[in-house]
Amino acid sequence: MKIRIGHGFDVHKFGADRPLILCGIEVPYETGLIAHSDGDVVLHAISDAILGAMALGDIGKHFPDTDAAYEGADSRVLLRHCFKLAREHGFAIGNLDVTIIAQAPKMLPHIEAMRAVLADDLQTELNNINVKATTTEKLGFTGRKEGIAVEAVVLMENVK
């Protein structure tokens, strides 16, 4: 098969006494996200999308939250591992589209830095990476500022 599509979704709750890390960068906010790893909800959704495109399960299978080895893990390392698996199967990023769903903090000032990190980690051109943010107009848990949700869709192209 020449192309594959993967979809990833993740949610994390606010409340951790640590920095808010999204796409590997620190985003100023009053609290971080609760998680076994560093809580980078964006990279978790992208990792799941890549694994899904390759029919390799999900990040819970590869990096279980019951394994102390992944406690506080840098999600960029996890993402790079997932991408390496895709490369081993002969695939590269065609394009990636990410939607961050959060009432706060505002994402716009950080979007270009996020795109640059992703392009670097996924060894692709910046114009293959899109990151956007939206709110739920104060509805639901994201609207009440209880957490952040992320959806990611990736098109993987066979390059062998």
From Swiss-Prot:
Its cofactor is a divalent metal cation. Keywords: Isoprene biosynthesis, Lyase, Metal-binding. A divalent metal cation binds at D10, H12, H44. InterPro entries: MECDP_synthase, MECDP_synthase_CS, MECDP_synthase_sf. Pathway: Isoprenoid biosynthesis; isopentenyl diphosphate biosynthesis via DXP pathway; isopentenyl diphosphate from 1-deoxy-D-xylulose 5-phosphate: step 4/6. GO terms for molecular function: 2-C-methyl-D-erythritol 2,4-cyclodiphosphate synthase activity; metal ion binding. It catalyses: 4-CDP-2-C-methyl-D-erythritol 2-phosphate = 2-C-methyl-D-erythritol 2,4-cyclic diphosphate + CMP. The keyword Metal-binding applies. Pfam families: YgbB. PROSITE patterns: ISPF (PS01350). Binds 1 divalent metal cation per subunit. 4-CDP-2-C-methyl-D-erythritol 2-phosphate binds at residues 10-12, 36-37, 58-60, 63-67, 102-108, 134-137, 141, 144. Involved in the biosynthesis of isopentenyl diphosphate (IPP) and dimethylallyl diphosphate (DMAPP), two major building blocks of isoprenoid compounds. Catalyzes the conversion of 4-diphosphocytidyl-2-C-methyl-D-erythritol 2-phosphate (CDP-ME2P) to 2-C-methyl-D-erythritol 2,4-cyclodiphosphate (ME-CPP) with a corresponding release of cytidine 5-monophosphate (CMP). This is 2-C-methyl-D-erythritol 2,4-cyclodiphosphate synthase. The lineage of its organism: Bacteria, Pseudomonadati, Pseudomonadota, Gammaproteobacteria, Alteromonadales.
